[in-house]
Amino acid sequence: MKILANDGIDAKGQAALEAMGCTVLTEKVNQDALAGFIQNENIDGLLVRSATTARKDLIDACPNLKFIGRGGVGIDNIDAVYAREKGVDVFNTPASSSASVAELVMSMLFASNRFIYQAGGSMPVNGEETFEVLKKNYGKGKEVKGKTLGIIGFGRIGQSLAEYALGCGMRVMFFDRSKTEQTVVLSINGSPVEVKLNVSSFEEVLRESDFI
């Protein structure tokens, strides 16, 4: 099987595919030349991220294409329904970005509570002359340990965020229309620790959370 990873692919992923006997091409093909390349090179599978689109015209122009894979969660750049109607399988990697998004949320939580953005802008410019004033202003940060984090929607990203928050000693509440409870599994030095969380109402989350 011949696969074009048009938006790149991690070396481990490429090696795994090649170990299964696939030929993986990683060259970037411009969107307007993509259909011709797929046909001329007898490409069986197309892997994309967000830069490349796979619309109806591409699908129609590539009748031998067997699948389109999206390295990420959203498939807005793929006409997935039409592709499946044409017998082209479409899949994504729903858990691939959960930890990344959760880490970004936690980094913003720490940064906002410790005035990191403001200090990073002010200290290099005025730190020498007004250090004592800035130190006093930016020394009023808050610890997140012991605070309550409210999460609206408790899918993969919400659960991953809960793992980080619980690991920091936070209390976690969540609201989700389709869940009544959820067990979050933390890995502590390689040992699993299960934490059972019960759903709260939307109003309870708003009322009791320090951060949402």
What are these regions (language model features)?
Residues 135-211:
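Rossmann-like dinucleotide/phosphate-binding beta-alpha-beta segment
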Residues 16, 104, 108, 160, ...:
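Rossmann-fold NAD(P)-dependent oxidoreductase module
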Residues 2-4, 22-25, 98-100, 109, ...:
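Structural/interface elements that position substrates and couple domains in central-metabolism enzymes
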Residues 86, 94-148:
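Phosphate-binding beta-alpha-beta segment of Rossmann-like dinucleotide-binding domains, i.e.
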Residues 53, 74-77, 96-97, 135, ...:
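Residue-level detector of alpha-helix initiation sites
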Residues 25-30, 49-50, 126-137, 191-199:
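Short gly/ser/thr-rich secondary-structure transition/capping motifs
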Residues 1-91, 207:
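An N-terminal-biased, well-structured beta-alpha scaffold segment characteristic
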